[in-house]
Amino acid sequence: MPGIAEESIAERTRRVLEPVLARDGYELVEVEWLRQGSRWTLRLFVDKPGGVGIEDCQAVSRLVDPILDVEDFIEPAYDLEVSSPGLDRPLRKPADFDRYAGQRAHVKAYGPVAGTAPGSPARKNWTGVLVGYRDGAVEIDVDGVVHRVPHDQIAKAHLEYDFEADLRRKD
């Protein structure tokens, strides 16, 4: 199946399932449609306040499986997987950047972006502490300098778990 079909399946899955999951208190964070060996996999990443456990993944699977069967828009046989977004949770929506303000994150642009901070050279990657989302841009503090990255220039963004900070808190 070509890449465009993969995008269409993921997009349609999101459109169909997002409102259903929201009614049950879940956020559909990510949808992946991928081939693993000879099998196709539809992978859903879900979250809710307080986090997601194995019971939640099972409940979501039981909820969406019959809906996907009725909608019947996925042509090849596939395996359905439901998972939490994990420690490196993807950040996509403007609200994600505000929700996780104060946490460590990595932001990657499609290409070099100039003028993200005064005197800063064009760059493609930023790793630092999220400040939030304002006026169409993600603000991220990198070593004490706040950079503003236009949201429409972001290819990928995700949380980065700070193991060293966690170890310091436990000492």
UniProtKB/Swiss-Prot annotation:
It comes from the Bacteria. The keyword Cytoplasm applies. The keyword Cytoplasm applies. GO terms for biological process: ribosomal small subunit assembly; translation. GO terms for cellular component: cytosol. Keywords: Cytoplasm, Ribosome biogenesis. HAMAP family: RimP. PANTHER family: RIBOSOME MATURATION FACTOR RIMP. Required for maturation of 30S ribosomal subunits. Belongs to the RimP family. This is Ribosome maturation factor RimP. It comes from Anaeromyxobacter sp. (strain Fw109-5).
